[in-house]
Amino acid sequence: MSSFAPPDASVLALADLIDRALPQTQCTRCGFPDCRAYATAIAEGRAGINQCPPGGQAGIETLARLTGSDVVALDPAHGVEGPRQLAVIDEAWCIGCTLCIKACPVDCIVGGPKLMHTVVDAQCTGCELCIPVCPVDCISLVNVTQDRTGWDAWSADLAQQSRQRYDFHRFRTEREQREQDERLARKAVATLAHLAEESKVTDPVELEHKRNLIEAALARSRLQRAV
């Protein structure tokens, strides 16, 4: 019998409340892959309420009220509270590698392979995830809220917009991965059907080994799609 037990409804409800109270920058500085994962970890008692630099001290106070916890200082291991920043691409140095586009959790960078990229300011969360992936170091951050920091530099409307954009980003990337997997699976099936005719390998033992490898890859692909 499976030992899996669904999450407690009260934990899920608390995670929902916490998630709505987070700024939704999806910056991962909390140590989790996204804001929802951090919210779930707090609700389950696996993370502290002081690991979100974008939310700052005001965010910690809100999370303390929601969880019944004591107000504590921001954990410096996760960063410091600061103003809202926007990513800016130096278009003269951009080589169009698309790595920043792939790294952006809210799809606010537009451009194409070997074409100039640019950031849509109104959609940028200042997550900084585009900075380390740029091979030519042509992305910088600009302070757009001066001395205002944390939630004083952010808003519930911006958080909601960012959550919606992140949800669509996840939907898009998962759909594209499925489509890519399906294309590869169709190609593998076609290769398998005409293996002897199209392969440069003529030795029967090597052909059978190649056939087994393709069949194993197809089996793994089917298993992944079924999960």
Which stretches of residues belong to each language-model region?
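Signature of N-terminal electron-transfer/Fe-S-associated modules in redox systems
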Residues: 2-29, 36-77
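Flanking helices and flexible, charged tails adjoining ferredoxin-like Fe-S electron-transfer domains
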Residues: 3-8, 82, 123, 129-227
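Ferredoxin-like iron-sulfur electron-transfer modules
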Residues: 14-24, 46-54, 73-96, 101, ...
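Residue-identity detector for threonine
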Residues: 25-28, 62, 67, 98, ...
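Short alpha-helical DNA-recognition segment
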Residues: 31, 104
